């Protein structure tokens, strides 16, 4: 099993670019930059895309330009066009249940209230069995404050921790392709930015 599509979830537009909800896109942007594969807008996939080579594997990158709750439209369009199965997809997203500075890989599961994941599961035929990269953004402590929190910008100290976790997640993604998911998971899950 190998990953053929890496997706970074986000809301489109400059006003959302620096908000916590866009952490998934920050990861894909970082990966694209690290591998010198600039993202370009591709309307038929409703997003920005690129193509990278990891250990001889052809991998597509995607940052949807739809709003978060319509992310599945972009993911399904690309998966269908390139005949990519759900278990060959890695979706990077912001995660309230992990603190800033932590990121974890996960296969399958629910959507945990995340509207981007919810729409992807739905558009993939109610199939939740894709890989996720959960990027910790922390929790406001009160569920009524979640919307304002994810659509807010993290303070500089938290942004630094999130950026370090994204850097490590990108390195661990490369480890995944070189040495397998178990090795990559073990390394990423013991990492915590200070």
Curated annotation (Swiss-Prot):
The record marks 11 as: Discriminates between blocked and unblocked aminoacyl-tRNA. InterPro entries: Pept_tRNA_hydro, Pept_tRNA_hydro_CS, Pept_tRNA_hydro_sf. TRNA binds at residues 16, 67, 69, 115. It is an enzyme of class 3 (hydrolase). One of its GO terms (cellular component) is cytoplasm. Its main location: cytoplasm. It is found in: Cytoplasm. Its EC number is 3.1.1.29. One of its GO terms (biological process) is protein quality control for misfolded or incompletely synthesized proteins. The active site is at 21 (proton acceptor). The record marks 94 as: Stabilizes the basic form of H active site to accept a proton. GO terms for molecular function: peptidyl-tRNA hydrolase activity; tRNA binding. Keywords: Cytoplasm, Hydrolase, RNA-binding, tRNA-binding. PROSITE patterns: PEPT_TRNA_HYDROL_1, PEPT_TRNA_HYDROL_2. Pfam families: Pept_tRNA_hydro (PF01195). It catalyses: an N-acyl-L-alpha-aminoacyl-tRNA + H2O = an N-acyl-L-amino acid + a tRNA + H(+). Belongs to the PTH family. Hydrolyzes ribosome-free peptidyl-tRNAs (with 1 or more amino acids incorporated), which drop off the ribosome during protein synthesis, or as a result of ribosome stalling. Catalyzes the release of premature peptidyl moieties from peptidyl-tRNA molecules trapped in stalled 50S ribosomal subunits, and thus maintains levels of free tRNAs and 50S ribosomes. Monomer. This is Peptidyl-tRNA hydrolase. It comes from Escherichia fergusonii (strain ATCC 35469 / DSM 13698 / CCUG 18766 / IAM 14443 / JCM 21226 / LMG 7866 / NBRC 102419 / NCTC 12128 / CDC 0568-73).
């Amino acid at each position: 099993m190998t990953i053929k599509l890496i997706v970074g979830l986000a809301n489109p537009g400059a006003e959302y670019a620096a908000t916590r909800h866009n952490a998934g896109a920050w990861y894909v942007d970082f990966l694209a930059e690290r591998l010198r594969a600039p993202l370009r807008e591709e309307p038929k996939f409703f997003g920005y895309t690129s193509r990278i080579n990891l250990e001889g594997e052809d991998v597509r990158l995607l940052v949807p330009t739809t709003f978060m709750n319509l992310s599945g439209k972009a993911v399904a369009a690309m998966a269908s066009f390139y005949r990519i199965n759900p278990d060959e997809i890695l979706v990077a997203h912001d995660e309230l249940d992990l603190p800033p500075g932590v990121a974890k890989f996960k296969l399958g599961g629910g959507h945990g209230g995340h509207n981007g994941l919810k729409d992807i599961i739905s558009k993939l035929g109610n199939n939740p069995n894709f890989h996720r990269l959960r990027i910790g953004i922390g929790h406001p402590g009160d569920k009524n404050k979640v919307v304002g929190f994810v659509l807010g910008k993290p303070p500089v100290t938290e942004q630094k921790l999130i950026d370090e976790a994204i850097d490590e997640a990108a390195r661990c993604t490369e480890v995944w392709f070189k040495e397998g998911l178990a090795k990559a998971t073990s390394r990423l899950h013991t990492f915590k930015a200070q």
